[in-house]
Amino acid sequence: MGALALSFGCAVGWGAFIMPGTTFLPIAGPWGTALGMALGAFVMLVIGVNYHFMMNRHPDAGGTYSYAKHELGYDHGVLSAWFLILVYIAIIWANASAIPLLCRHLLGDTFKVGGHYHIADFDIYGAEVLLVLGAIWLFGWVCIRGGRLVASVQIFMALLLFFGLAVVFCVALSKQGGKVLMPQPLFVPWASKFSVVVNIMVLAPWAFAGFESISQSTEEFTFSPRKAFMIMLIGVLAGGAAYIMLTLLAASAYPSEYKDWIVYIRDIKKFTGYHALPTFHATHEYLGKTGLVVLGVAVLAGIITGLVGNYIAASRLIYSMAHDELLPSWFCRLNRWGIPQNAILFIMILSFPIPFLGRTAIGWIVDVNTIGATIAYIYTSTVAFKAAKDAGNVPVQITGLVGMVISLGFFMYFMVPNFWTVSGMSTESYLILIAWSILGFVFFRYIFQRDKEKRIGKSTVLWVTMLFLIFFTSMLWLRESMHDTTRVVMDKINRYNVARFSEYHVQLTKTENSDAEYYLQKQLGWLNSTMTQDSLIQMALLMLSLFIMFNIYKSMIQRENKMEKEKDSAERSSQAKSTFLSNMSHDIRTPMNAIVGYVGLVKKEPGLSPKATEYLQKIELSSQHLLTLINDVLDNSIFCRYSVAFGERPGSFFTRPT
């Protein structure tokens, strides 16, 4: 039950209650969102099959990191872990910083007290900062206690979350069944039904990020890992149902002055309080203030499950890396409850400055989450395909290949802005991704220098790809920055022209202002398309250059390896010859010494004829000469067998060496 609460709780958080009004309905409408979420859930289940296979193959802590290191090497494990850590920690930050937002919409200005300042147009108040700091500390402490406490909290909050949503939705159905299930229009009228469904489906990595978090704690399971897929299945289906219920609910009720949800969503920024959140407005319409309390408790429960679940996932990932001696051993020390307490403390300390940055800045970091999640899904699907191929498991080979292709599609979809997507990451998010990737190189250098077992640094392709990612992201950041600057400049030019018209008492009609705005938007769209095309061409040229550079580097390495092998072969051959000559010389010298000795004895015998003495002298001379040759061969073989080392000593041509 605890594992199910972890999977479901990590997948559904604050965003599930906000995104229907800000993203889902404007993109696709209620039914477009429902169909897209259903397809997205199916895609996540395909990836879930890959996780399930790998959890049974490698049932230890670390999740994707563990699978990648076992199947592809530690380089790949480090890269996947680097992005996964950001995913889990950023979700902690997003959920913690959502508590003040919930209070603002439901409690008004209650916590808008204390010191006040703003960052990136977001107002930050001292009381709200203390509220977030308290949540970070409280649920970090709950996770440190571990055991029954953390399991009970997670299960209770997950039940509150799901049944709170179910109660609100069922009451709405009982009052306005047809209107809730069939809110008109079912799809947005300005795009094809197929395209809007796809646009929602590709949000699946963001919507369901965390459903796989149980893979980080596999070695702590009190049940067989074979049951993990059923847990992820229920978690994903429950998460998908939550997103669909909230979207249908948001579209079913709107203020009386609006004819449908489209006009209401278009003017949503004009509202404050719970009216600015379509899900809360609809709940108030159907259940009054009681409904707001029920839904508010459900939202708070979703925030808490996200905090606790991602604390657990991030700490287990850090623990696994420390256990492999990639991080200091301090991180893998367990407390009396068997919890990696220091890893959780590190996450808490890292999180304490975050509330002071404001929600907007945190949103920039959270935008990078989708990229990190897709990288993890790419790795898990790839290693599942490889491992299944080795094991002869055809079904998992299929899911691994499908998951790999889909995850790569997700990655490109979110990385290239305004090409396939309705909206890309913010300019600041690209800069954060660049910074995090560069920090990844710094971290790699840190562990490479301390890798006593020489496990790191064996995949040149991986780090060339990482370098390409930095270059590519840098181009996209520059492109987005130029686009933002151009938008500001064109807006200033437009305001200047309007002011000049006013000086000459020329007032533009509403239609003329709309036409001018439409023209500016059209020109910005053309500029955006041109910049996207140029960026893709630049990316292709960069990719080609890196490919050629890597090919040359690979050829150089192969040549050096070949020369090294030839050198080793020549040395072995020379050593074999030297050994043979040494043995042969020894075998010949022994009888030759005997011959010389016997000749000497014979020469001492009395009565030898002069002719015999002459022959003996010639034999002796020939034997001595042959022994000299044999000794030279033996000395040469000994010299070749051992290397001679020469040392350096300071000296001068003008002083005699001592």
Show where each model-derived region lies.
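Loop-to-transmembrane helix boundary motifs in multi-pass membrane proteins
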Residues: 1, 89, 126-133, 222-227, ...
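Extracellular loop-to-transmembrane helix junctions
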Residues: 16-120, 235-238, 433-435
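Transmembrane helix-loop boundary segments of multi-pass membrane transporters
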Residues: 24-28, 107, 111-125, 148-158, ...
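Helix-loop-helix junctions that connect adjacent transmembrane segments
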Residues: 30-34, 111-127, 155-292
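TM-loop-TM module centered on a large, flexible mid-protein loop between adjacent transmembrane helices
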Residues: 66-68, 73, 105-110, 231-308, ...
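Membrane-interface loop-to-helix entry segments
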Residues: 127-178, 232-236, 369-379, 392-404, ...
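A generic transmembrane alpha-helix motif of multi-pass inner-membrane proteins
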Residues: 395-551
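Primarily the dimerization/phosphotransfer
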Residues: 562-614, 618-631, 635-646
